[in-house]
């Protein structure tokens, strides 16, 4: 009996010892797994010892970094190596011996490899997080065998393929995050697979399907789902039905932005938990459900921007809203008569009308208020008294008039943009007393007098020493007077200084060279005299002092800028070793610019297209620093909340990453081509944007200098140059070569669509192609890219916010690609990426120069003067191109000399940039027409249209202006002095015609002989007919018939 008791006691001791011991199999599995891991800082393996270093091989290795054991059984239950700077190709099959592993978390490293099916054999796993790495391949179907799994995060990797079936088996799953991969599947089928989940983030993938689903498809998650993010996918069809959306009783966050969801929104009924609703960048239309703006739904954030909503918004009585974005829709009527509560309000890009002063009645006290690009009128209320917290104010591009109100109190204004209105009178002194102001844009108004200064020399243009934060000052296109003071150098942080198109005078102070951060300086179209100061900031990428009365020698450090930075005007300004500028056509005649609307048009390109966009992003970048994430992804998990701070960046990557000889300065500010709120408001909800994450892994976030110049057209400095006027966006001068850095295939989620079978290339080949900037336009930026085989392409990057939805874009691109004509440069392909800044058009690169270069480039003269017969040949070939397009009911839409290329040796015409408006949103088309109008090529009927769109007859008008330019060798933007005062080109030609002196208009280079004088007069008569009123204007076939009948 005693032997039996002894045996039982020893057996119990052995059993107890084994229950608290790690097995050798587990240790060996761990050590095998370690072999694939490297520390990126030391390039060594992670410091796990082998079993020989353990005092007792059966002891749990709790001292190994990231390893945890069960205190009761001793088995390894957790491997947590989050954000340790590790890399390596992991072999997940080596973990099969860890049969009791509960937590495997490897996020935020640089691991790669495939997730093998055997991982599904570790049925004890409860938490699996492989996010923010480089894992690739399909998600194995056996992952559905992890019965105990409650948290699965595979986001921000390179997984691809279909969504695996069998997720219905994961009854314990509460959080599913697969965002930023290449996974596809029908969202309706996926909803059917999920059971009891609370958090679902499938954003930035390729999921498709609609949301108008039967109740049985969503019944398994309708009671539990709290957070749903399907943004940046390819969803189409309708939104949830009224019945189905009403079944989600616990839903807190819904983000479906950047899809193709269409139709009207249903009534939302009772949604007691809904706090964030983001439906921006879809195809929704109809009325905005009123309950979304009332307190019945406790929304904190509502973003319906960039859709097609219509109707009026009478009142907004929600007491919970902190962010409301209804921008870029078709909303109309008066501004809401009441607005209870909100911190960020964006109603821009609609057609709201009425008196802007109604905002004084609002109870809301916003930090950010954007009412830009509407039809508002009336006078501006004093916002410092109405909104004490206001830091960002934009009312640009309206019809608000009267004098500017004074600002006072403890306001902390960061950005004020009142450009493109009808303000008059003096600028109040108080605008220059807010030390926090970083950006002030009062351009394109009717302001006069000096820029005020609180000091003894108030009559001069001075800058306050107490104004250290100013980074952008744009007062262009007004009637300001006075001198530029010597102490302007106190604006130490200024990056953009635009004082063009005013009546400023005096000499340029030498203290301009103290503006060490200056990137853009435009002092053109004033009456400055004297010499240009030496040693201006070397990093400037936009510089223009043309149309002044400067003299002396151009400083050596400025001689890399093109001639259009200095001329026309400045007839006494010279450059050693070069022929002086031809001043015979000098446009700096006294009083020229202030007596003509065209000088104002020219400045629109800088002040409107660039500054207005950029200002809005300065503004929001500042505002975002004051907002906190109130609801992060990790609310539904046990992860550290610090992880999502990277999604709060204000910058977004450009498709092209430049590396050039232009020095780039760092800045605390970041600028984006996207909208004021839609790009960055996701930080409020903790929902990441695809773009923000790419800047983490794919390319550095764009700094202020880079995007500053993308959005702010250079005033003929290094970055771009003029085609007929000093501020136009034509590609007259090339930049230094830069590298075209498209995301490589392992990161490039979009597709190349070929419209011509003869073109064959891959995204990888495009990504490594050396490229140089050719120019910028209202559409975006133009590059020349050289492929591996030497073939050269012209790549047009389309600016964010201009492009139609993918289906419409593809349909129209196919039509444009089908156009085949010997004088038309064909569209060969296009690239469509998941991010808005990834829209590219590809065509063959042409050797040759634009018609604008042949007509106007004279410093030095690079081209022989064109004869009348050569000019007539150009006109006929352009008309033939237009006839081809018009026969297919497709207007060119952007016809100007910079889009007419003359190929050697016989100056054969090749037309470019045609029909691009068909790929653009209505706002993008309107912006293109605005720029056409600024340059003088837009038909008058387009300027007065509420929703302008290019027509066949507007092409004829533009052709008529170009024909006048061919015959007169004067630019459409020229201001010409005559007996009746300063007039533009078309008015001058009409006047000459009325007075019977047509030959006075003809260019001296071709008007000398009598042989072709009748032909020249006949051609000029054709041009005049082309610019008649739309009802009297001939069609292009009639124009071509007349031109071909002229002898030359």
From Swiss-Prot:
<keyword id="KW-1133">Transmembrane helix</keyword>
<dbReference type="Pfam" id="PF13516">
    <property type="entry name" value="LRR_6"/>
</dbReference>
<dbReference type="GO" id="GO:0005886">
    <property type="term" value="C:plasma membrane"/>
</dbReference>
<feature type="repeat" description="LRR 4">
    <location>
        <begin position="172"/>
        <end position="194"/>
    </location>
</feature>
<feature type="region of interest" description="Disordered">
    <location>
        <begin position="696"/>
        <end position="733"/>
    </location>
</feature>
<feature type="repeat" description="LRR 15">
    <location>
        <begin position="469"/>
        <end position="491"/>
    </location>
</feature>
<feature type="transmembrane region" description="Helical">
    <location>
        <begin position="602"/>
        <end position="622"/>
    </location>
</feature>
<keyword id="KW-0472">Membrane</keyword>
<feature type="repeat" description="LRR 11">
    <location>
        <begin position="365"/>
        <end position="387"/>
    </location>
</feature>
<feature type="repeat" description="LRR 7">
    <location>
        <begin position="250"/>
        <end position="272"/>
    </location>
</feature>
<dbReference type="InterPro" id="IPR001611">
    <property type="entry name" value="Leu-rich_rpt"/>
</dbReference>
<dbReference type="InterPro" id="IPR000719">
    <property type="entry name" value="Prot_kinase_dom"/>
</dbReference>
<dbReference type="Pfam" id="PF13855">
    <property type="entry name" value="LRR_8"/>
</dbReference>
<keyword id="KW-0433">Leucine-rich repeat</keyword>
<dbReference type="Pfam" id="PF08263">
    <property type="entry name" value="LRRNT_2"/>
</dbReference>
<protein>
    <recommendedName>
        <fullName>Probable inactive receptor kinase At5g10020</fullName>
    </recommendedName>
</protein>
<feature type="repeat" description="LRR 13">
    <location>
        <begin position="412"/>
        <end position="433"/>
    </location>
</feature>
<dbReference type="InterPro" id="IPR013210">
    <property type="entry name" value="LRR_N_plant-typ"/>
</dbReference>
<keyword id="KW-0067">ATP-binding</keyword>
<dbReference type="GO" id="GO:0004672">
    <property type="term" value="F:protein kinase activity"/>
</dbReference>
<feature type="repeat" description="LRR 18">
    <location>
        <begin position="540"/>
        <end position="560"/>
    </location>
</feature>
<feature type="signal peptide">
    <location>
        <begin position="1"/>
        <end position="21"/>
    </location>
</feature>
<feature type="binding site">
    <location>
        <position position="796"/>
    </location>
    <ligand>
        <name>ATP</name>
    </ligand>
</feature>
<dbReference type="InterPro" id="IPR032675">
    <property type="entry name" value="LRR_dom_sf"/>
</dbReference>
<keyword id="KW-0812">Transmembrane</keyword>
<keyword id="KW-0675">Receptor</keyword>
<feature type="repeat" description="LRR 16">
    <location>
        <begin position="493"/>
        <end position="516"/>
    </location>
</feature>
<feature type="repeat" description="LRR 6">
    <location>
        <begin position="224"/>
        <end position="246"/>
    </location>
</feature>
<dbReference type="GO" id="GO:0005524">
    <property type="term" value="F:ATP binding"/>
</dbReference>
<feature type="compositionally biased region" description="Low complexity">
    <location>
        <begin position="716"/>
        <end position="733"/>
    </location>
</feature>
<keyword id="KW-0732">Signal</keyword>
<feature type="repeat" description="LRR 12">
    <location>
        <begin position="389"/>
        <end position="411"/>
    </location>
</feature>
<feature type="repeat" description="LRR 10">
    <location>
        <begin position="320"/>
        <end position="342"/>
    </location>
</feature>
<feature type="binding site">
    <location>
        <begin position="774"/>
        <end position="782"/>
    </location>
    <ligand>
        <name>ATP</name>
    </ligand>
</feature>
<keyword id="KW-0597">Phosphoprotein</keyword>
<keyword id="KW-0547">Nucleotide-binding</keyword>
<feature type="repeat" description="LRR 8">
    <location>
        <begin position="273"/>
        <end position="294"/>
    </location>
</feature>
<dbReference type="InterPro" id="IPR053059">
    <property type="entry name" value="Inactive_SerThr-Kinase_ABA"/>
</dbReference>
<dbReference type="Pfam" id="PF00069">
    <property type="entry name" value="Pkinase"/>
</dbReference>
<comment type="similarity">
    <text>Belongs to the protein kinase superfamily.</text>
</comment>
<keyword id="KW-0677">Repeat</keyword>
<feature type="repeat" description="LRR 3">
    <location>
        <begin position="148"/>
        <end position="169"/>
    </location>
</feature>
